[in-house]
Design a protein with these regions (language model features):
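Active-site beta-alpha connecting loops in nucleotide-dependent enzymes
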Residues: 140-143, 165-167, 172-238, 249
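Conserved phosphate/oxyanion-binding catalytic-loop motifs
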Residues: 159
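Short amphipathic alpha-helical segments
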Residues: 4-7, 27-28, 61-64, 169-171, ...
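Alpha-helical segments flanking ligand/cofactor-binding loops in enzyme cores
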Residues: 30, 37, 41, 172, ...
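Acidic, Mg2+-coordinating active-site environments of NTP-dependent enzymes
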Residues: 1-2, 6-156, 233-244
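C-terminal structured "cap/appendage" subdomains that terminate the fold
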Residues: 235, 243-263
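Short glycine-dipeptide loop
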Residues: 45-49, 179, 262-263
């Protein structure tokens, strides 16, 4: 719609998922979907439209494309498939199209990302074995499920998660890897952005974390207290009783370290 890629000719387009984001601009989810779909509608016939059919909009995105459709999935039959064999904080073992591959990345969402990468490379003519070898050398991006060594045998995981879907993916991943450890979630929401996702993120945090610390996260022109109140609105009494609301981010981080015991 903004024609940011107007005039460019793409060899491939990848649809991974469509989640709650950018609604401050698009206003409705349907409009957000329509704008995303335009990209695939305009792909040339000699391109590849690569889509995640595990997302409910995966097939909708490519229903009018002229490009060759290639599907991928971690849950069902598709042109290319993947599943997590095992995972820890150090990485995960994947089985992609029947071949095993180790990755330093963790989480189901990263399994999807790696499968999308693999599907695209193979569709464009790369050798599958060479792609898997190259994928095994990839390191996590800073601030994306970044594993920091904390004090007192505490695991500290930093992630940019700024949407409900991203926060849920991160917390679920940590729960799966360490189901018996206490999970403390420290987060905030940016100011002058989509306000409707704030209570949803509060609800997700109370559902998946043992303790929650809500703090500032680039409030821009908004009052931090107002942003925190929006997050709090998504929590019930139980969630609020397990939460601390600390505006100063440095103080919030110090508090998280202080209340975290060994094994957290």
């Amino acid at each position: 719609e903004q024609e940011r890629v107007s005039g460019l000719r793409f060899k491939a387009g990848i649809f991974s998922n469509l989640t709650h984001d950018h609604l401050d601009y698009h206003k409705t989810f349907a409009e957000y979907l329509r704008c995303k779909k335009l990209f695939f509608d305009n792909l040339p016939s000699d391109a590849f439209a690569i889509t995640n059919i595990d997302d409910r909009n995966g097939l909708v995105m490519v229903q009018n494309t002229k490009a060759k459709v290639v599907t991928y999935s971690c849950r069902s039959m598709a042109d290319h498939t993947c599943r997590i064999v095992e995972q820890s904080f150090e990485g995960m073992l994947l089985r992609i199209d029947g071949r095993e591959s180790w990755s330093c990345l963790i989480g189901q969402h990263n399994a999807y990302n790696l499968l999308a990468l693999y599907t695209t490379a193979v569709s464009l003519g790369a050798d599958p074995e060479e792609v898997l070898v190259a994928m095994s050398t990839l390191r996590p991006a800073p601030g994306r499920l970044e594993n920091m060594k904390g004090p007192k045998d505490i695991s500290v995981i930093i992630d940019y998660a700024h949407t409900p879907d991203a926060l849920e993916n991160v917390l679920k991943t940590l729960r799966e890897i360490a189901p018996d450890r206490e999970l403390i979630c420290l987060f905030g929401c940016g100011g002058d952005r989509d306000r409707t996702k704030r209570p949803e993120m509060g609800q997700i945090a109370q559902k998946l974390a043992d303790r929650i610390i809500v703090t500032a996260d680039n409030s821009r022109t908004e009052k931090t207290a107002d942003i925190m109140a929006d997050i709090k609105a998504g929590m019930d009494l139980n969630g609020r009783s397990r939460s601390l609301f600390i505006q100063d981010r440095e103080e919030a981080i110090r508090t998280a370290v202080m209340i975290a015991g060994p094994g957290a």
